[in-house]
Amino acid sequence: MGARKKRAPRRGSLGFSPRKRASRLVPRVKRWPEVDIGKPVPLAFLGYRAGMTHVFMVDDRPGRPTSGKEIFVPVTIVETPPMFVAAVRLYGYDPNRGRYSLGEAWAQPPPELELQRRISTLGSFDTDKMLKSLEERLDKAEDVRLIAASQPKLAGGLSKKKPDLLEIKVGGVSDVTKLFDYAKDVLGNLIAVNDVFEEGQLVDVIAVTKGKGFQGVIKRWGVKELPRWHKHRKGSRRIGARSHGRSTFWETPQAGQTGFHRRTEYNKRILMIDDDGYKVTPAGGFLRYGVVRSTFVMLSGSIPGTPKRPIVMRWAIRPPEWYLKLGVRKPEITYISLASKQGV
């Protein structure tokens, strides 16, 4: 009679523990890449997930068996209406206390933005006075950030009016004075996704995944299901032993919340940026979303989240070597599927 092997591979990753619900629907960007392109540029943008389709394009990645040939690529459409730059914030750095805010300057938002739905205490501002106060502290500044508000009313698939706020780092150069001058120029104005990204660029996608509620260990951790025979009369979709409650290790797989987690997916390529949403809207519209009516971004592959969910796109923080050598190249798309997604 054969003996069971003494070790099995660990099921599931402890790197994502605790597996709890995300604290906020619009994720906060925790890390920013160091970008040097010779001019200031915002390093992130917010959009709303519309849905998926597929395209045919010429594979321009070097060293691939399909290089130079037409390939099938699944894509995700993210609708990205222009964002209003509501405020500029400066951060200083202290070795003992870390990063701290030096102050901020707010611009008066237009009435159609309805920013008071998000910030109920919003009042009137003396923007020039606040900017002058920031300039006096510019010698202590390490980071320049923009507080930008989305315009969900311009998105075709959304019915909400409350804008979402996102803090965006301004990068591209190391001179803080140039970064601050750029922030002053865009304060109170709109920025488009074309001002942040370009076609062919790699971005990181940060979003909250689709929620699945309370699930067992098989679905939540991927543990192996036990054989269904008489010696496993207590169940098969469970772990073999957990011990009693007081001495259970935290690494032990247990049932609980699954999904609705904040996740980051790296190096998603932008295949297209366009203002005509009908180029990518399938017949009958995207399921649970509708028609794309404003500027959109087409990303290769899948991304986290459900339709209508806020998606944060950030400059790639760890791009591959081939991308660093060849740079940004515009993809050659030969076909976009507009077939209906009903019943798929």
From Swiss-Prot:
GO terms for molecular function: rRNA binding; structural constituent of ribosome. GO terms for cellular component: cytosolic large ribosomal subunit. GO terms for biological process: translation. The keyword Zinc-finger does not apply. Pfam families: Ribosomal_L3. Keywords: Ribonucleoprotein, Ribosomal protein, RNA-binding, rRNA-binding. Belongs to the universal ribosomal protein uL3 family. Part of the 50S ribosomal subunit. Forms a cluster with proteins L14 and L24e. One of the primary rRNA binding proteins, it binds directly near the 3'-end of the 23S rRNA, where it nucleates assembly of the 50S subunit. This is Large ribosomal subunit protein uL3. It comes from Aeropyrum pernix (strain ATCC 700893 / DSM 11879 / JCM 9820 / NBRC 100138 / K1). The gene is rpl3.
